[in-house]
Every structure is written in C-alpha cells, then in structure tokens.
A protein has these predicted regions:
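Phosphate/oxyanion-binding loops and surfaces in catalytic or ligand/nucleic-acid-binding neighborhoods
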Residues: 19, 23, 47, 51-55, ...
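Short hydrophobic/aromatic patch on the recognition helix
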Residues: 1-6
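Amphipathic alpha-helical segments used for helix-helix packing
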Residues: 52-72
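C-terminal alpha-helix
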Residues: 91, 144-148
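Hydrophobic alpha-helical connector segments
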Residues: 15, 19, 29-56, 107-114
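Hydrophobic/aromatic-rich alpha-helical bundle segments in the mid-to-C-terminal region
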Residues: 96-143
Length: 152
C-alpha cells in the first residue's frame, strides 16, 4: 500500500538516501563551530541514527541494504555525489587542515572507512532485529573508531 506513492520499491528505497541527505543538510544549518571534526562527525551520526531509529522501520532499512547488494544498477549508498559524501569530504579535509586528523591517511581513505563503519553499524542493527539501541551503541563505538584517525 505504501509503495503506490513511488515508482516501485527501488524508488522507495533510493528515497531513503535522499531522506538521509536532507537530514544532513538540515543539521549543517545548525551552529556547530565549537566542535572539532570528530565531535562533528559523532554528532551528525547521532542525529542521523536518532532519525533512523525513530522514523525508519528496520524492515525498510534492511531492504535498502539487501537491494544495494543485489542491484546491477545504481548503488545509491555508494554514490560519491551524494550530499553525505560531499559533507564527509569537507569535514575530514578541514579536520586534516586543522591538524585534528592524521595525515597518514588520505581524505578519501578516512571518508571510506567512516562510511563503511556507519553502514556496518546499521547493517548489524538490522541483522539483530533492532534488539539494542542503534543510537546508544553508536554513541559508544563511533568515538572509539574515530579516535584511530586523530592526529597524535
């Protein structure tokens, strides 16, 4: 019934990426100048995961991952032109310029690792049927993960 608003399931699923990107655009309008890049990435992650936990069904998120695994066409989650990737590149690049992040890894390597870790958190949450809070778990794990990229 929900699908009749979209041109099939693929359009519905790809709209999730658009929803996430729109959320990032809204968040970046809020003041965040006081944060270093790791705090900013953790905050964005918390806000996105709160949106996901409160408004996106696990079944729909699982279908998005499933469809991206089997699709031969466009993989929305990996589209480097998305707001998500542009924003991550900007934050990581500034983090390196401000000497908050290591320069032993390229911007692209750090962005790829971050996106992969974030997807992994969502994927595991789907696999476990949401038996734990995605937001709470990411609040503990994301800073530990990102600390590995902090300039020593």
């Amino acid at each position: 019934a929900f699908y009749h608003y979209f041109d099939g399931k693929d359009a519905l699923l790809s709209s999730l990426s658009v929803l996430f990107d729109e959320r990032y655009e809204e968040l970046m309008q809020q003041p965040h100048d006081e944060m270093d890049c790791i705090e900013l990435l953790c905050w964005l992650n918390q806000e996105l995961f709160t949106t996901i936990e409160n408004t996106v069904s696990i079944e729909l998120l699982a279908r998005l991952f499933s469809s991206q695994l089997v699709t031969k066409g466009e993989k929305h989650l990996l589209d480097r032109k998305r707001t998500y990737y542009r924003l991550l590149r900007q934050i990581v690049s500034q983090g390196q310029e401000r000497e908050e992040l290591t320069d032993t890894r390229t911007v692209s390597e750090i962005v790829k690792a971050y996106a992969m870790f974030e997807r992994g958190l969502m994927y595991d949450w789907c696999l476990s049927g949401g038996e734990y809070s995605l937001v709470q778990y990411a609040r503990e794990m994301m800073p530990l993960f990102l600390d590995g990229f902090r300039k020593k």
